[in-house]
């Protein structure tokens, strides 16, 4: 299936769905050998797919677990640039729906996930209070997870260099 993304000249846009997975005071992120940062569990929404279906699919693909959605938590407008990889040199604009996933009560996961460029991914449980010590995206996650929220948050970040 085709992701909802496109490139026009030096601009790249993607519609993304991601899960916020918290177990025992830790939040789940993913890393890989190619990148020097961690990123949230999720990926591009496919054409004709709802964001809820996309987050269920991606969370399962990346963790091997069928987490249930608790609620839509954040709509994130993200502007950034990449210094390497497939997006090198592009001005990136991403709109992401972040869903809080229901905890399972355990952190045991089996991942056999790869990036679009076929690089093996590794799951990382990061203690929420230590998240600021990591280069992890989205950058708002530690602040979001340490405050109470009753509705859907709209967050805009601009990390273009």
Region roles according to the model:
Residues 1-18, 24, 89:
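Acidic, metal-coordinating catalytic segment for phosphate/diphosphate chemistry
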Residues 11-13, 87-95, 115-120:
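A generic structural micro-feature
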Residues 21, 98-102, 125-127:
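Short, well-ordered beta-strand micro-motif
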Residues 23-65:
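Conserved Nudix-box catalytic region and its N-terminal flanking loop in Nudix hydrolases
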Residues 25-27, 35-36, 46, 75-81, ...:
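Short, charged/polar surface micro-motifs in flexible loops or helix N-caps
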Residues 33-37, 108-161:
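Nudix hydrolase/Nudix homology domain
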Residues 66-75:
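A short coil-to-beta-strand element that immediately follows conserved catalytic motifs
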Residues 80-110, 144:
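Active-site-adjacent beta-strand/loop module that shapes the phosphate/pyrophosphate-binding cleft
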């Amino acid at each position: 299936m085709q992701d909802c993304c496109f490139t026009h000249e030096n601009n790249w846009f993607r519609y993304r769905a991601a899960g916020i997975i918290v177990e025992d005071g830790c939040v789940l992120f993913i890393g890989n050998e190619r990148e020097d940062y961690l990123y949230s569990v999720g990926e591009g929404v496919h054409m004709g797919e709802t964001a809820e279906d996309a987050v269920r699919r991606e969370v399962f693909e990346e963790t091997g677990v069928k987490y249930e959605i608790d609620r839509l938590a954040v709509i994130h407008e993200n502007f950034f640039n990449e210094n390497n990889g497939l997006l090198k040199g592009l001005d990136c604009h991403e709109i992401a729906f972040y869903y809080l996933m229901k905890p399972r009560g355990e952190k045991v996961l089996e991942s056999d996930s790869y990036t679009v460029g076929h690089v093996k991914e590794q799951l990382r449980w990061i203690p929420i209070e230590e998240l600021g010590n990591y280069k992890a995206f989205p950058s708002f996650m530690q602040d979001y997870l340490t405050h109470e929220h009753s509705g859907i948050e709209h967050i805009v970040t601009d990390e273009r260099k």
